[in-house]
C-alpha cells in the first residue's frame, strides 16, 4: 500500500480539444456481435475457429441468421461509411468444398453490394487471424479509398508486450 500520494509531472500535455481539419471520409467501427455464417448447433459441435476445434457463436437457426444479417446490413447501410472496422465476425474455420477464405465478411460485402451496386464495397482479405473463433475485419469503398500495401497484425510476434493468449490480434490497414 502506498503511504503517500503520487507525484505527477506532465510530460506530454494534451490539447483541451482536438484540432479538426476538413475531411471527406467517413470512418466507423461496428461490432457485429458474433456474426457467423456457420450455424451454431449447440454444445459439442466443435467446427468453428481456425483449427475447427471451437463451438460456433451467433445464430442458432438459418432463420435467426437471416434476421441477424438483415439487421447488420440495415445498420451498415444507414451509417454508409467509407471504411468500416468490423469487430466480432466469424474467423475462418478449415474450409469445406465450395468455401472460400473470409466467407463471413464476404457475405456482408455481398449484401451491401446487392443494395448499393456491384463493387461499391470490398474487404481486406485476411484469412484466419489468431486462434479465436472471432476476428476483426475491414470493409471499405474502393471508390473512396485504396489499400496501400498489405494489412498488418499486432501480435506477440510484433511486440512481446502484446500477449496473444489474452488479446485478439489487432488488424490495421493503410489507405
For each predicted feature, which ranges?
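Divalent cation-coordinating acidic motifs and surrounding scaffolds
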Residues: 1-175
Amino acid at each position: 500500500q502506498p503511504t503517500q500520494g503520487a507525484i505527477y509531472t506532465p510530460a506530454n500535455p494534451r490539447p483541451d480539444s482536438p484540432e479538426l481539419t476538413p475531411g471527406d471520409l467517413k470512418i466507423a467501427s461496428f461490432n457485429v456481435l458474433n456474426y457467423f455464417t456457420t450455424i451454431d448447433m449447440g454444445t459439442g459441435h466443435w467446427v468453428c475457429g481456425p483449427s475447427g476445434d471451437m463451438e460456433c457463436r451467433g445464430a442458432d437457426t438459418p432463420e435467426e441468421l437471416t434476421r441477424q444479417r438483415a439487421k447488420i446490413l440495415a445498420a451498415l447501410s444507414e451509417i454508409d461509411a467509407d471504411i468500416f472496422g468490423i469487430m466480432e465476425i466469424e474467423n475462418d474455420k478449415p474450409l469445406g468444398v465450395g468455401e472460400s477464405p473470409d466467407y463471413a465478411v464476404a457475405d456482408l460485402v455481398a449484401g451491401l453490394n446487392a443494395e448499393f451496386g456491384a463493387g461499391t464495397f470490398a474487404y481486406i482479405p485476411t484469412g484466419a487471424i489468431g486462434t479465436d473463433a472471432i476476428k476483426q475485419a475491414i470493409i471499405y469503398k474502393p471508390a473512396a479509398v485504396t489499400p496501400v500495401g498489405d494489412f498488418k497484425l499486432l501480435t506477440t510476434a510484433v511486440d512481446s508486450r502484446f500477449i496473444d493468449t489474452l488479446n485478439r490480434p489487432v488488424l490495421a490497414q493503410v489507405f
